């Protein structure tokens, strides 16, 4: 084998000195760099390391965009950054380059652990960031990892302790912080939030707060998004006190410009809710040579529209993507859509942010977005990196005026399009025929109807989304249904709670129910025979219980007008279960029963008391007199004192609760680490006790004959115990010259085998 060339000690010292000098020069360049005077055009003009420049050049990133030119120098100087720029302006490189440079300046190694954390709201965006990082960090000696839902958690746990740059979604990152023993965030240098406004909203609030509580406050924080939040409460949660606001949307010149790309042509059409699918199908039929994304409000709608349009064959490839799909299917769909030229993708907002699809011609928003920020992110999937693109928004007459006013407030004024009647085609008869033939499609249509109605109900902007004015019967007929299905709508609080649970990791929910040792009580699994499975089998498609509940007829409603309804049919009564109706036989018993009734009736309702320091009882809720109340001051003063007192108490209790939760989490991790250590020690003890060193006795001089006896036992029953080798000049005389037997250890590697062969040949 060819030996690796190793540097001498002197050369190693020289190399380290050169690296130290280059790093000092680079740090001086960063201090002297002024973005206003030094108008950098390419990445090579920036004070960054040669490895980063080389990686950017090989990945074809030469010239900088406006957000990169503004954000990278500020981040290199160690400031916290709040970055905002239009969609498709290159925000990913604006935070990945400072991440690499930060760890390079700190001379980060694998032994230092986690140095940078990048949080993304969606799995697809996290995968895209990871791919870009691998490209530009090719010549840097850092390890990077991706942790997202839908992947093997145990596989990630084994490797997460050796990662320097970790990219992931909030739920999976929090799960690793709670479960992975090797993940240590106490030495974190930089935190990045991509699409920060989405990460800071209610859906990820608890997960993000828990993640930030595990991070050191001395870190550098970078926040990037196309629609940035400057709420003081949100920034305080991330410990952003002294930060710099950068971006193309910051400054006096940008105040009169919209937040959408300049090359994006924006249109809208007024269409009634029952006519939306007709217009959508007609639009797809007239744009067969285009690449388009169609946004719908729920995964059920995406599934229904995809299945029905696929059967009607509009003449273009159709794909669908939503959050309820498996991760492998989502990744495969993203890859196919990126490589396709003429294709239509039906999707929810799971790809509305950050995802870079090449050459998207049209973005169609079939359902009205919940706010202007969502509109900007959806429309931003087209016209990226200076290319042209078009956006089409469908608005109902109830939504038109209010939502256009919201858009005008952000300087966005889409042009109105009129639909040609010759291009319009009704697909309602085809949908009715499909639903009549296929009960599963009918089930999907009912679920799509229910999910759309619920999505309108939970919207906060009631001026745009008018729930009471929805034409439900006409909308159901447009989906091919004979009538509007029953919709059970819970309160908004329960819906928001369900939405919050949707973004929470299932493993984290299980871990929350764990005991102090971190163990989750699992139900004992009973053995099910094939007969149990056969009798307990249910149809999971058409005749499922959920399907029957939705499609049940109105027979039950016919009896609703009856005055009395049957709750239970006639059944036999067990006499043993009936109570005794006889009175007490003795006079004493009768008197006792009567006295109890009399005493209870005279006592009245029970009351509870609390005792003061002197032992005097007082009712729990005791009202003060008017004079006593006014002695303490006026109402406003007392309210302020009470609020300040309670606020101080809640803040103190909140700090104590956070500290307690942190200590419990650390204790759980410590116990798991201790259990792993004991397990490793037990395995080592077993190896020391049973695994004696294997010895091969070579006496023939023919290595192939001696090593071929692999089927024979390793130890002969009468073999002598291994002898200790003698050192010095007596080592040769220790071997017996008469027998010609030489004692050696069994070769483990190829190098050991080569050295053993050379010794045997030399005799």
Swiss-Prot record:
**Chain positions of motif DEAD box:** 194-197
Its BP terms in the Gene Ontology are: rRNA processing
GO molecular function term, any single one: RNA helicase activity
- Sequence ranges of Acidic residues compositional bias: 682-691, 743-754
Q: Where on this chain is Q motif (motif)?
A: 41-69
What are the residue boundaries of the Helicase C-terminal domain, all occurrences included? 276-435
The answer to whether keyword Hydrolase applies is yes
Which is one Gene Ontology cellular component term of this protein?
A: nucleolus
Q: Which residue ranges are recorded for the region named Disordered?
A: 574-613, 681-763
Enzyme nomenclature, EC number: 3.6.4.13
Compositional bias of type Polar residues: which residue ranges? 577-587
Under SMART domains, the record lists: DEXDc (SM00487), DUF4217 (SM01178), HELICc (SM00490)
Q: Which UniProt keywords apply?
A: ATP-binding, Helicase, Hydrolase, Nucleotide-binding, Nucleus, Ribosome biogenesis, RNA-binding, rRNA processing
Cystines in this chain: none
Using the UniProt record, name the top-level EC class of this enzyme in a single word: hydrolase
Annotated ATP binding lies at 85-92
Cite the record's note on assembly.
Interacts with the U3 and U14 snoRNAs. Associates with pre-ribosomal complexes.
> Can you name this protein?
ATP-dependent RNA helicase DBP4
Q: Organism source for this protein? A: Eremothecium gossypii (strain ATCC 10895 / CBS 109.51 / FGSC 9923 / NRRL Y-1056) (Yeast)
Q: Which gene encodes it?
A: DBP4
């Amino acid at each position: 084998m060819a030996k690796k060339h190793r540097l001498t000690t002197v050369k190693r010292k020289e190399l380290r000195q050169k690296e130290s000098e280059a790093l000092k020069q680079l740090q001086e360049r960063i201090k002297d760099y002024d973005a206003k005077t030094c108008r950098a055009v390419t990445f090579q003009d920036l004070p960054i390391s040669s490895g980063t420049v080389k990686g950017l050049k090989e990945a074809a990133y030469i010239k900088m965009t406006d957000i990169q030119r503004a954000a990278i120098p500020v981040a290199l100087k160690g400031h916290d950054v709040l970055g905002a720029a239009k969609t498709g302006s290159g925000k990913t490189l604006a935070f990945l380059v400072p991440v690499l440079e930060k760890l390079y300046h700190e001379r980060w190694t694998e032994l230092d652990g986690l140095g940078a954390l990048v949080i993304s709201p969606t799995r697809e965006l996290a995968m895209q960031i990871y791919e870009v990082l691998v490209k530009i960090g090719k010549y840097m000696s850092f390890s990077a990892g991706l942790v997202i839902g839908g992947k093997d958690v145990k596989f990630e746990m084994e490797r997460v302790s050796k990662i320097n740059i970790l990219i992931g979604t909030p739920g999976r990152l929090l799960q690793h912080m709670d479960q992975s023993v090797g993940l240590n965030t106490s030495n974190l240098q930089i935190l990045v939030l991509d699409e920060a406004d989405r990460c800071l909203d209610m859906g990820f609030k608890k997960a993000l707060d828990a993640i930030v509580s595990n991070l050191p406050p001395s870190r550098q924080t970078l926040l990037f998004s196309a629609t940035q939040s400057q709420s003081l409460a949100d920034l305080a949660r991330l410990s952003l006190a002294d930060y710099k606001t950068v971006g193309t949307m910051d400054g006096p010149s940008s105040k009169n410009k919209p937040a959408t790309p300049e090359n994006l042509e924006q249109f809208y059409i007024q269409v009634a809710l029952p006519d939306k699918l007709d217009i959508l199908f007609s639009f797809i039929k007239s744009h067969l040579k285009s690449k388009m994304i169609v946004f719908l409000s729920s995964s059920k709608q995406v599934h229904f529209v995809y299945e029905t349009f696929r059967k009607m064959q509009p003449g273009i490839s159709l794909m669908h993507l939503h959050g309820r799909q498996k991760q492998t299917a989502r990744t495969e769909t993203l890859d196919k859509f990126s490589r396709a030229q003429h294709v239509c993708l039906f999707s929810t907002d799971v790809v509305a942010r950050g995802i870079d699809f090449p050459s998207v011609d049209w973005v169609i928003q079939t359902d009205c977005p919940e706010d202007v920020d969502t509109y900007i992110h959806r429309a931003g999937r087209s016209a990226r990196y200076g290319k042209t693109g078009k956006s089409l928004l469908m608005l109902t007459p109830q939504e038109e005026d209010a939502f256009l006013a919201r858009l005008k407030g952000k300087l966005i004024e889409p042009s109105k399009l009129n639909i040609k009647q010759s291009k319009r085609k009704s697909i309602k008869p085809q949908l009715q025929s499909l639903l009549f033939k296929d009960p599963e499609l009918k089930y999907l249509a009912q679920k799509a109807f229910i999910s759309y109605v619920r999505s309108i109900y939970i919207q906060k902007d009631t001026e745009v989304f008018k729930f009471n004015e929805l034409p439900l019967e006409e909308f159901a007929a447009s989906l091919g249904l004979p009538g509007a299905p029953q919709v059970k709508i819970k309160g908004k609080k329960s819906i928001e709670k369900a939405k919050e649970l949707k973004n929470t990791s299932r493993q984290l929910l299980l871990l929350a129910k764990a005991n102090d040792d971190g163990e989750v009580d699992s139900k004992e699994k009973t053995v099910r025979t094939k007969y149990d499975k056969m009798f307990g089998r249910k149809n999971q498609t058409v005749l499922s219980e959920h399907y029957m509940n939705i499609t049940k007829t109105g027979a039950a409603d016919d009896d609703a007008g009856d005055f009395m309804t049957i709750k239970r049919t006639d059944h036999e009564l067990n006499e043993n279960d009936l109570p005794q109706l006889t009175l007490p036989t003795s006079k004493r018993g009768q008197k006792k029963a009567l006295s109890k009734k009399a005493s209870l009736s005279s006592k009245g309702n029970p009351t509870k008391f609390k005792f003061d320091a002197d032992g005097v009882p007082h009712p729990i809720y005791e009202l003060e007199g008017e004079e006593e109340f006014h002695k303490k001051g006026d109402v406003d003063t007392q309210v302020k004192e009470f609020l300040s007192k309670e606020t101080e108490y809640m803040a103190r209790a909140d700090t104590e609760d956070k500290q307690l939760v942190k200590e419990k989490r650390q204790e759980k991790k410590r116990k798991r680490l201790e259990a792993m250590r004991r397990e490793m020690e037990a395995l080592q003890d077993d190896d020391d006790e049973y695994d004696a060193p294997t010895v091969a006795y070579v006496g023939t001089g023919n290595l192939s004959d001696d090593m071929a006896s692999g089927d024979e036992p390793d130890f002969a029953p009468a073999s002598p115990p291994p002898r200790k080798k003698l050192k010095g000049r007596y080592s040769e005389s220790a071997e017996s010259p008469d027998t010609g037997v030489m004692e050696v250890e069994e070769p483990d590697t190829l190098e050991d085998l080569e050295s053993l062969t050379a010794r045997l040949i030399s005799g």
